[in-house]
Amino acid sequence: MSKIVKVIGREIIDSRGNPTVEAEVHLEGGFVGMAAAPSGASTGSREALELRDGDKSRFLGKGVLKALEAVNGPIAQALLGKDAKDQATVDQIMIDLDGTENKSKFGANAILAVSLANAKAAAAAKGMPLYAHIAELNGTPGVYSMPLPMMNIINGGEHADNNVDIQEFMIQPVGAKTLKEAVRMGAEVFHNLAKVLKSKGYNTAVGDEGGFAPNLKSNAEALEVIAEAVAAAGYKLGTDITLAMDCAASEFYDAEKKEYNLKGEGRVFTSNGFSDFLADLTTKFPIVSIEDGLDESDWDGFAYQTAELGKKIQIVGDDLFVTNTKILKRGIDNGIANSILIKFNQIGSLTETLAAIKMAKDAGYTAVISHRSGETEDATIADLAVGTAAGQIKTGSMSRSDRVAKYNQLIRIEEALGAKAPFRGLKEVKNQA
């Protein structure tokens, strides 16, 4: 009943109005799985390749017809008759057929969409929710947890058209007892932040991930207005709500000069100087997690940053590790960072994603499941977070349906699992247990 009988790909639209790949996998017995590939804006140079057509007369060159040719042609042919429940084999067939290191022949967007659709079809054939199937694929059947959200309520960098250099300023509702309560707390802070920004004459338009995108006097002011919003919502900063940042520092790094240029506030830093700047912020605000605090190639700088902050807070590698076990192993071996951001499409298949999560956990690193800035209504990452008991999730702010879809799926899963999926809050964050 779990043999693949048909694979279909189509071009749909993501949250930025760009095309992306959606795939359907059909099994014997009428079971169907459907999934869509997300797309990043600030991307690591070592990510698996997202295949775009380059035809400027169509979607400004961002069409995905070439990727769809792979889905509807060689991938579909190769997977006919295969057992969808054997996810590792399905993924390996596509990887081998592509034959490149970075999936550049078919595109990671093509392979990933089919990989996730296959998992959904297999879950349907087994008569179980996707998170339960993922837990079985992960070798941890029945082991679940609800993730602590990192909610990106001020957007900057590549995610917004403003003067804020640091890409994401996030809140974590650590005082919540359940995921549903955490979502409520986040929503209340989000609405109070709108009031705080309006009172200061700031814009309340939102960026790619649903957070506000005002022009501010400095990056530190973003933390200050969030602190005001937390208080206005009736919560205590550092107890009920903690803070996290994604610097996406590769986006403001000058490789020739080896400098970090915060143009929005007219400040330039050396590598160690920028780490010291971040360390100073952690003394002024309850920041418990910093992601991509340096350029992806600045491994010496990351060694310094990890030595300075790695015993105190969570140091997350996103562009640094790109969900790639080879690169993550180098980081583990050299004591670089202490956490990895997990993005399906950086590596391009569910099997490889699960391998990265396992490697991180085995080494004592945390794994933070993440969306991309270009998303769809597909909420698979919610099931991934619960099914791997990863403990943390980044899926944007409290606006835009492409973000809220993931929170709503988490609420449904928590309702279904109850006490079987504990919400551990701050204990999930490295160095905060």
From Swiss-Prot:
Chain residues that bind Mg(2+): D246, E291, D318
Gene Ontology cellular-component annotations: cell surface; extracellular region; phosphopyruvate hydratase complex
Major site of localization recorded for this protein: cytoplasm
Keywords, sorted A to Z: Cytoplasm, Glycolysis, Lyase, Magnesium, Metal-binding, Secreted
E.C. code: 4.2.1.11
Enzyme class: lyase
Protein name (Swiss-Prot/TrEMBL): Enolase
Residues annotated to bind (2R)-2-phosphoglycerate: Q167, K343, R372, S373, K394
GN (gene name): eno
Cofactor binding note of this UniProt entry: Binds a second Mg(2+) ion via substrate during catalysis.
Superkingdom: Bacteria
Known pathway: Carbohydrate degradation; glycolysis; pyruvate from D-glyceraldehyde 3-phosphate: step 4/5
Presence of keyword Transport: no
